[in-house]
Amino acid sequence: MKLSMPRFDQAPVLVVGDVMLDRYWHGGTSRISPEAPVPVVKVEQIEDRPGGAANVALNIAALGAPAALVGVTGEDEARQSLVDSLAAAGVRAHFQCLEHQPTIVKLRVMSRHQQLLRMDFEEPFDTDPAALLTDVESLLAGVKVLVLSDYGKGALKNHQALIQAARRHGIPVLADPKGKDFEIYRGASLITPNLGEFEAIVGHCADEAELVAKGAELMRQLELGALLVTRGEHGMTLLRPEHAPLHLPARAREVFDVTGAGDTVISTLAASLAAGEELPQAVALANLAAGIVVGKLGTAAISAPELRRAVQREEGSERGVMTVEQLLTVVEDARAQGEKIVFTNGCFDILHAGHVTYLEQARAQGDRLVVAVNDDGSVSRLKGPGRPINSVDRRMAVLAGLEAVDWVVCFAEDTPENLLAQVRPDVLVKGGDYGVDQVVGADLVKAYGGVVKVLGLVENSSTTAIVEKIRKA
């Protein structure tokens, strides 16, 4: 399945559901309490993060998609913490505020990256479904997907009214279901239960065949557009009427914390569908996102650069031959990680030991090496008739196989100045015995604060000499 990074900036999503605050007390533990056989935690840091439906909205915004959120809170400091955090992330929050009920808070006591205790502060909300529906209807015209983030805490009491309102606007509805009554999600475009939630409705599934059969029957009964069952370490399974099941293996490299993984799945799905991705591609992106987030501690969001790198790994484009557009994307991501970009260029017609040594020295000037290669027309103009010996595709393929080289790209001009202006490397490297000021592009690189270096060439290593020797043989 071919994956690409969606245009999330053009994918507005509305999230409606149970808003909560995830609060973390971090501290050290070095002794047991004399009062009871429990550890004593010396609290050193208090951290608040949006949770529940608020975490879904935060994940959507972190991907770069416009996110709006409708939910219910109390009139307290936890609400203000949510408002501040969401505003800082660019989420437009519309909260129904209840004076006599608290905002839901999940307090976790953490020590040495381990959760020791969780305390829940909550009461079922006594909400006004009509007021919530009014808020949602006022926002539907400006979004492309509606997400129902249901934790069974009372914010969502009119599921069918919300689904029907979205359908009148032609907007797909995604629901992360809770409880043992999935009838309330009838007519949804997609629901995303985990395996435990799914089996609580349909009964135990002995194998994948039974899961598929029971899932198909559930879709028929509830008139669902699709069903996605998330299965932890076994990945996820997408079922659609009149389509073969799609099984995707889990992508996590290391699992530290599954908190909020379901939120990440539905948020990535929603943003991807809003950006115009087909459902299988959106599910594959959500699977990659889940694999990233479970490698983080606590309720966490993933960023667009993190997902983009995962897509590039999946498509085998993290290294190697690239288009200019692909190169600019990976350079941007590498720079965001604090990596120093090195740039060099040349014809590299017949690769020899001198080239390899030079490229290794160039790579040592930073963290990532970009090699820009003259295309065939450019080489012919520079070197004369009969050159290049090897086509640009072959030259680039050989360079991409070198350990020192991260990315290879070609250019059609006689000099790489236009490409340099786009890449803006931290270090421009050229091999030869001339001065820095004679290097093409040196003025451009130095003007924005970059560094230009000239490396010596390996003696008795010349492509031109090799070509002449072969011709005389």
Curated annotation (Swiss-Prot):
Protein EC: 2.7.1.167, 2.7.7.70
Pathway(s) it belongs to: Nucleotide-sugar biosynthesis; ADP-L-glycero-beta-D-manno-heptose biosynthesis; ADP-L-glycero-beta-D-manno-heptose from D-glycero-beta-D-manno-heptose 7-phosphate: step 1/4; Nucleotide-sugar biosynthesis; ADP-L-glycero-beta-D-manno-heptose biosynthesis; ADP-L-glycero-beta-D-manno-heptose from D-glycero-beta-D-manno-heptose 7-phosphate: step 3/4
Sequence segments annotated as region (Cytidylyltransferase): 343-473
Active site: D263
GO cellular component: cytosol
GO MF annotation list: ATP binding; heptose 7-phosphate kinase activity; heptose-1-phosphate adenylyltransferase activity; phosphotransferase activity, alcohol group as acceptor
GO BP: ADP-L-glycero-beta-D-manno-heptose biosynthetic process
Ribokinase as annotated region, ranges: 1-318
Keyword set, alphabetical order: ATP-binding, Carbohydrate metabolism, Kinase, Multifunctional enzyme, Nucleotide-binding, Nucleotidyltransferase, Transferase
UniProt-annotated binding residues for ATP: N194, L195, G196, E197
Family: In the N-terminal section; belongs to the carbohydrate kinase PfkB family.
Primary role: Catalyzes the ADP transfer from ATP to D-glycero-beta-D-manno-heptose 1-phosphate, yielding ADP-D-glycero-beta-D-manno-heptose.
PANTHER family reported in the protein's UniProt record: BIFUNCTIONAL PROTEIN HLDE (PTHR46969:SF1)
Quaternary state and interactors: Homodimer.
UniProt-recorded name of the protein: Bifunctional protein HldE
Organism of this sequence: Stutzerimonas stutzeri (strain A1501)
Name of the gene: hldE
